[in-house]
UniProtKB/Swiss-Prot annotation:
It comes from the Bacteria. The keyword Chaperone applies. The gene is hscB. Belongs to the HscB family. One of its GO terms (molecular function) is ATPase activator activity. Co-chaperone involved in the maturation of iron-sulfur cluster-containing proteins. Seems to help targeting proteins to be folded toward HscA. One of its GO terms (biological process) is protein folding. GO terms for cellular component: iron-sulfur cluster transfer complex. This is Co-chaperone protein HscB.
C-alpha cells in the first residue's frame, strides 16, 4: 500500500497538510503499539511494524521535496537511491558561483549581504518549486524529476546559508 492510500489521500503532490496531520494522529491512535501490549506477540510485532510505516509515511509526505520524490517513485523514478545527476551545465555553474559567493560572505561575516543572498536563493527555490508543482500536475514525470534534482541543490544551499546565518548571529 502506498503512503497516499495509507492516509486516505489522492496520490497528488498538492495536499492538505492539516488533513494529513489529522489522519496521521488517527492512524497513530489506532495502531499505537501500546494498544497491543496484552495481545499475542505476532499482533504486537505487526502493530510495531505498522506504526513504523505510518511514521515513515508521515515524514515523507509532510515535507515538500520528499513528497515529490515519493510521488515520482510511484511513477518509476527512484530519486532517493539513484546515481543520476543534473546534466544542466548552466545550472551547475550557477550553483558553483552561488557556493563561492556564500563562502565569501562567510569569510567577510557580512550579515546584510547574507540576508540578501538568502532572499535570492529563496526566490530561486520558489520559482523552481512552482515549476515542479506544474510538472507534477501535468504528469511530465521526466521534467519533474529533473526539477526535483535541481531543487535538492537549492535546498542544500539554503540550509548552508541558514547555518551560516546562525553562526554569524552567535558571534
Amino acid at each position: 500500500m502506498d503512503y497516499f492510500t495509507l492516509f486516505g489521500l489522492p496520490a497528488s503532490y498538492t495536499l492538505s497538510l492539516e488533513q494529513l496531520a489529522v489522519r496521521y494522529q488517527d492512524l497513530q491512535r489506532q495502531y499505537h503499539p501500546d494498544k497491543f501490549a496484552s495481545a499475542p506477540a505476532a499482533e504486537q510485532l505487526a502493530a510495531v511494524q505498522h506504526s513504523a510505516t505510518i511514521n515513515q509515511a508521515w515524514q515523507t509526505l509532510r515535507h515538500p521535496l520528499t513528497r515529490a520524490e515519493y510521488l515520482l517513485s510511484l511513477h518509476g523514478f527512484d530519486l532517493a537511491s539513484e546515481q543520476h545527476t543534473v546534466r544542466d551545465t548552466a545550472f551547475l555553474m550557477e550553483q558553483l558561483e552561488l557556493r563561492e559567493e556564500l563562502d565569501e560572505i562567510g569569510q567577510a561575516k557580512d550579515e546584510a549581504r547574507l540576508e540578501a543572498f538568502i532572499k535570492r536563493v529563496k526566490a530561486l527555490f520558489d520559482t523552481r518549486h512552482q515549476l515542479m508543482v506544474e510538472q507534477l500536475q501535468n504528469e511530465t514525470w521526466d521534467a519533474a524529476a529533473d526539477t526535483v534534482r535541481k531543487l535538492r541543490f537549492l535546498d542544500k544551499l539554503r540550509s548552508s546559508a541558514e547555518e551560516l546565518e546562525e553562526k554569524l548571529l552567535d558571534f
